[in-house]
Amino acid sequence: MKLGVFTPVFGTLKLDEVLVKVRRLEHVQALELGTGGWPGSDHIDLSALLDKKPCVAEYRQKIADAGLSISALSCHSNPLHPDAATARAADDVFRKSVRLAEQLEVPVVVTFSGCPGDSEGATRPNWVTAPWPPEFLDILDWQWEKKAIPYWQDAAQFAGDHGVKVALEAHPGFIVYNVDSALRLRKAVGPNLGVNFDPSHLFWQGVDVPAAIRALGDAIFHFHAKDVAIDPHNVAVNGVIDTKTYRRMAERSWLFRSVGWGHDELEWKRIVSALRLSGYDYVMSIEHEDALASVDEGLQAAVDMLSRVILTEPPVQAWWT
């Protein structure tokens, strides 16, 4: 297992500057690159690289010369959006990201499952969170059977044809937001579709993260190291479903934090142990979205914590059995 960094945090920097900065972060060995959608594409240009072998080779070499690898290409967006143009744009960046991942020899593309509307005439997504009134269940059935499953059957097949795995980040607001929904879609689509496991979206739902990791097992294709802090006072008053903007930090029930600032070192040791028990031995990619810390301070805090808990060497053979 090794540490990586998700690059949107360096959106104001050029790639060469990013490489210099990351090389100074001891223990970090990989980059997760945004290729479009919500992460943006500040450090890799799909159109400039795709199907241009010399450019692809030069880009790969630049990353390698910095002592780094690329863990994933990430294009988080909503390919199920009821607005056709929005959905087409999301699908286009996903497919281009898959093709470029193949050419860069990157094994996985990360995105969201997306969320449809409630009918063919919808213009905005509709995330259903309750089984009652009963029409909500009708909406859910339609979303899954008519939109999510058909789209991802085709998209995962496309990725598989290019030797690339699809890792969906379980995120509230989308069809896949927890273990149950992730496994439901994987069962319908096939083993080339799995999960980008981000504990920050599960902690505040009340999920025991190590238990969720064990439940997903080999469906975990990539991992985001990001923490969340629960505000006990605000939760006591309003619960955990919170639509306040992230700028209203003091009023929110939870906030994204640097690793270690939401959950302690023991909890992250439990997470690393669960990943190893589940067979995951790839990258823990640090995603910095802590509005209370600077980029440098927040990233360093995450690296310091994770470098103490990550297991980088193969496990011992149990001679005591």
Question: For each predicted feature, which ranges?
Answer:
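Flexible loop residues that form catalytic
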Residues: 36, 78, 114, 228, ...
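A short acidic, glycine-rich active-site loop
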Residues: 44-55, 133-150, 248-264
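Short, basic/glycine-rich phosphate-binding loops at helix/coil junctions
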Residues: 70-72, 128-131, 248-251
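Short beta-strand segments at enzyme active-site cores
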Residues: 31-33, 70-74, 107-114, 166-169, ...
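Active-site acidic/histidine proton-transfer and metal-coordination neighborhood
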Residues: 17, 58, 62-65, 79-194, ...
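Aromatic- and acidic-residue-enriched segments that line the glycan-binding/catalytic groove
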Residues: 47-50, 117-132, 235-244
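Histidine-acidic metal/acid-base catalytic patches
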Residues: 1-30, 57, 64-66, 84, ...
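Glycine-rich, proline-tolerant flexible connector loops at the mouths of alpha/beta enzymes
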Residues: 32-58, 114-120
